[in-house]
Curated annotation (Swiss-Prot):
Positions with biased composition (Basic and acidic residues): 206-219
Primary role: This is one of the proteins that binds to the 5S RNA in the ribosome where it forms part of the central protuberance.
Protein name as it appears in the record: Large ribosomal subunit protein bL25
SUPFAM superfamilies per record: Ribosomal protein L25-like
This protein's record includes keyword Protease: no
Molecular function terms, GO-annotated: 5S rRNA binding; structural constituent of ribosome
InterPro entries: Rbsml_bL25/Gln-tRNA_synth_N, Ribosomal_bL25/Gln-tRNA_synth, Ribosomal_bL25_b-dom, Ribosomal_bL25_C, Ribosomal_bL25_long, Ribosomal_L25_dom, Ribosomal_uL5_bac-type
GO biological process, one term: translation
Length: 219
């Protein structure tokens, strides 16, 4: 995994609303560096550098250069503005390149199942990320899940993932990731034809009887 290097600035009066607003007005994002049995450090990072880290992919290893020294970290959380959807705050977690860490990695479907083309089967991805344990440099940005051989009524489970031996998957190995569903056909039931014989009304029957009687008298 490529290591990213950026400069961050120390910030004072952490958490003060006016200070945070001033930082954001300068196209910077407030952040904190924590973990590693050290005291947290309040810093700020430019929006440009943060976007570069996020573009590189989740769980990217970042070297943060501060006036107090260098910190090796990964992004643990990004908070976004509820309206503008812009980064509002970033949490960086200190890491050691020699120690395994637990992270969550996205699952990306690849390939195309023949049953989707032939039968119109629907793809139902029930698990979109998985927790793993690995050295920071061995952590993938995403894990590919090939559905080319997937058929109807079958599923791909966590245990079916093809991963490096350096990566340990956490959680239930039998948990399903994706399966194919048969589309439910709408059955159209035709309404039965109205073939029942309608009973004659009393007035009609009386008229027929009267006509019959008159015909006999004429004879």
């Amino acid at each position: 995994m490529e290591e990213i290097k950026v400069n961050v600035e120390l910030r004072e009066k952490a958490g003060v609303k006016g200070v945070l607003s001033a930082i954001r007005a300068e196209k910077k994002v407030p952040a904190v560096i924590y973990g590693g049995q050290k005291e947290p450090i309040s810093v700020s990072i430019t929006e440009k550098d943060l976007k570069a880290i996020l573009k590189a992919g989740s769980n990217s290893v970042v070297t943060l250069s501060t006036p107090a020294g260098k910190e090796t970290a990964i992004i643990k959380e990004v908070q976004y503005h509820v309206v503008k959807d812009t980064p509002n705050h970033v949490d960086f977690q200190r890491i050691s390149l020699k120690e395994k860490i637990d992270v969550v990695v996205p699952l990306k479907l690849t390939g195309e199942s023949a049953d989707v083309k032939i039968y119109g089967a629907l793809i139902n991805q029930v698990l979109r990320e998985v927790a793993i344990r690995a050295l920071p440099t061995a952590i993938p940005h995403e894990i590919a899940v090939d559905i080319s051989a997937l058929t109807i009524h079958k599923a791909i489970h966590i245990s079916d993932l093809s991963l490096s031996k350096d990566i340990e998957v956490l959680g239930d190995p039998e948990r399903a990731i994706v399966h194919l569903m048969v589309p439910r056909e709408e059955e159209t039931v035709a309404a039965p034809a109205d073939t029942a014989v309608q009973p004659e009304s009393s007035s009609t029957k009386g008229k027929k009887d009267e006509d019959g009687a008159l015909a006999k008298d004429k004879k």
